[in-house]
């Protein structure tokens, strides 16, 4: 049986190590030598496992700072709508002020940006006369501005009052 075990160890490439281990275990050691050998091994293991510590950066905080940006846009032409849509794609909130825009251009911009918002699973809220908030999916808009709150401000965009 011993030959079978030795043969198995030699196949596995462990034959020489077992002989060395047996020789080492037979040699008598004093108590101090055992303690020093043990402490030396544990110190070596500790050195191998210790890694230099690096400063820890909180990724959540950095990510939240990026996501909390709000972009205020007041487009003069429809061509600026694409840049506004890019802000939403980059997960930034957009406040769109169309008070100075002509009706046709404002309607086209609202249609384009609301389509982008829908495609990105975002949300849209009217907060004033011709002022809208568009938010990506990572931001929830809470609260509603009722028609009574906006009654003092006359909106030239009748279609925007439907909410």
UniProtKB/Swiss-Prot annotation:
* Keyword flag Cell cycle: yes
Q: Name one GO cellular component term.
A: cytoplasm
GO terms, biological process: division septum assembly; FtsZ-dependent cytokinesis
Q: Know the name of this protein?
A: Cell division protein SepF
Please give the InterPro entries that the UniProt record associates with this protein. Answer: Cell_div_SepF, Cell_div_SepF/SepF-rel, SepF-like_sf
Membership in a protein family: Belongs to the SepF family.
What does it do?
Answer: Cell division protein that is part of the divisome complex and is recruited early to the Z-ring. Probably stimulates Z-ring formation, perhaps through the cross-linking of FtsZ protofilaments. Its function overlaps with FtsA.
- Top-rank taxon: Bacteria
Gene name, Swiss-Prot/TrEMBL: sepF
Q: Which residue intervals make up region (Disordered)?
A: 25-53
Q: Where does this polypeptide localize?
A: Cytoplasm
List keywords of the entry alphabetically.
Cell cycle, Cell division, Cytoplasm, Septation
The UniProt regions of compositional bias labelled Basic and acidic residues, in chain numbering, are: 30-51
The question of whether Cell division is a record keyword is answered with yes
What is the originating organism of this protein? Answer: Heliobacterium modesticaldum (strain ATCC 51547 / Ice1)
């Amino acid at each position: 049986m011993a030959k079978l075990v030795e043969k198995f160890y030699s196949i596995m490439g462990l034959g020489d190590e077992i002989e060395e281990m047996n020789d080492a275990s037979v040699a008598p050691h004093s108590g101090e030598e055992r303690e020093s050998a043990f402490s030396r091994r544990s110190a070596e293991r500790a050195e191998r496992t210790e890694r230099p510590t690096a400063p820890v950066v909180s990724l959540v905080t950095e990510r939240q700072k990026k996501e909390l940006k709000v972009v205020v846009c007041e487009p003069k032409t429809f061509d600026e709508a694409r840049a506004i849509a890019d802000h939403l794609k980059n997960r930034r909130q957009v406040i769109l002020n169309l008070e100075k825009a002509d009706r046709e251009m404002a309607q086209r911009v609202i249609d384009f940006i609301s389509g982008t918002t829908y495609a990105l699973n975002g949300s849209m809220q009217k907060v004033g006369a011709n002022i809208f908030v568009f938010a990506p999916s990572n931001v929830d808009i809470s609260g509603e501005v009722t028609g009574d709150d906006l009654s003092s401000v006359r909106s030239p965009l009748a279609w925007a009052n439907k909410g």
